[in-house]
């Protein structure tokens, strides 16, 4: 058996080596006992934890700073969330790196401020699974395609957290590792892992305060006081892509269509009107795949594929249309999905 040599002291915090080792042993034991031998109990606990994470993002008061990491990209944001009993949710999300951006939200009404253009984009929120929210469906449905592992306790941003790993049951999706606040269930850190366990993307609070009073007034006032800003309301509307002749039925377990919409996209050619683009979004509860359809005649591009962190993109041509698939899934998943897409014009 290999011998492990320990230093007499650890320089971080100047803690005795004995205390450091004891903490490590306790953590390991906690993880071992947390998983247990009962898969039914593990699945039930994991489903409850997932649902609690999603509910906490909507029902808790919190404010803090979180960091998004993907490859060499590191971006910090400040978030404030107030959950009121009679007046819904108020949220402020502000970028701290790069060009300034601020998003203010009251329930599903979103106001995105772009200072360098003195622009305010007003639109309805389309997705409710942005960090620190998580799910696009129930925790039980997520576990139909992911295998849960309860990994015990840890600490994130100074708070005690419970750790859950979700391993895919197939090769169509990535694994996830989640840290949730032990007291409230709020998601503190989320990692997307490749098949080798390497981190592709991470979102993590570096500082957060949960509970107590959060003043909604600055958010409400910011929403009301838009004088001097150019207000833009993109005309987003629901669309029935199947009625138009599109057959979008992914032969990938777990993915369900959660919404379809049409929105204008700026033309690549100066002086040309916006291009109508149809979008269908499919989700397995954690990962999402978007399918964009736009006419070839109004957009010059090429077929191809690419990736950035966990996000992959695939561009294909189907007759007179460009099909773009975008999602936090392996490239092979997009390829398989694309192979099933058909267009049969309605007569």
Q: What kind of region is each of these model predictions?
A:
Residues 3-19:
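Bacterial N-terminal signal peptides that target proteins for export
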Residues 16-28:
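Bacterial N-terminal signal peptides
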Residues 30-34:
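Sec/Tat signal peptide C-region and signal peptidase I cleavage site
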Residues 35-118, 144-182, 186-193:
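N-terminal mature ectodomain segment of secretory-pathway/periplasmic proteins
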Residues 114-133:
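Acidic/charged, solvent-exposed loop-and-adjacent secondary-structure segments enriched in E/D, K/R, S/T
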Residues 184-186, 193, 197-216, 322-347:
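Surface-exposed amphipathic alpha-helical segments
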Residues 211-240, 347:
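Short, gly/Ser/Thr-rich active-site loops of penicillin-recognizing serine hydrolases
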Residues 227-319, 331-336:
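Short, solvent-exposed recognition patches
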């Amino acid at each position: 058996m290999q011998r492990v040599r320990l230093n007499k002291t650890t320089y971080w915090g100047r803690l005795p080596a004995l205390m450091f080792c004891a903490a490590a042993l306790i953590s390991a034991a906690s993880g071992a006992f947390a998983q247990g031998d009962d898969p039914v109990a593990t699945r039930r606990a994991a489903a409850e934890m997932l649902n609690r994470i999603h509910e906490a993002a909507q029902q808790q008061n919190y404010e803090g700073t979180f960091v998004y990491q993907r490859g060499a990209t590191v971006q910090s944001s400040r978030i404030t969330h107030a959950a009121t009993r009679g007046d819904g949710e108020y949220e402020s999300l502000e970028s701290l790196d790069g060009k300034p951006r601020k998003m203010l939200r009251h329930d599903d009404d979103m106001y995105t401020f772009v200072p360098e253009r003195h622009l305010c984009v007003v639109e309805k929120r389309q997705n409710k699974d942005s960090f620190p929210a998580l799910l696009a469906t129930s925790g039980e449905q997520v576990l139909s395609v992911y295998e849960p592992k309860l990994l015990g306790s840890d600490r994130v941003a100074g708070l005690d957290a419970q750790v859950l790993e979700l391993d895919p049951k197939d090769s169509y999706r990535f694994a996830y590792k989640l840290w949730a606040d032990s007291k409230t269930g709020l998601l503190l850190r989320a990692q997307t892992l490749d098949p080798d366990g390497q981190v592709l993307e991470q979102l993590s609070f570096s500082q957060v305060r949960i509970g107590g009073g959060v003043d909604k007034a600055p958010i409400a006032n910011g929403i009301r006081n838009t004088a001097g800003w150019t207000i833009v309301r993109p005309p987003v509307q629901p669309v029935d892509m199947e009625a138009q002749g599109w057959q979008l039925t992914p032969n990938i377990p777990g993915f369900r269509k959660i919404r379809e919409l049409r929105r204008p996209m700026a033309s690549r050619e100066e002086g040309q009107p916006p291009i109508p683009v149809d979008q269908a979004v499919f989700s397995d509860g954690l990962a999402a795949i978007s399918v964009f359809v736009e006419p070839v005649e109004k957009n010059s591009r090429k077929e191809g594929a690419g990736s950035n962190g966990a996000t992959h993109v695939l561009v294909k041509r189907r007759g007179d249309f460009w099909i773009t698939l975008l999602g936090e899934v392996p490239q092979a998943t997009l390829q398989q999905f694309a192979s099933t897409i058909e267009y049969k014009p309605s007569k």
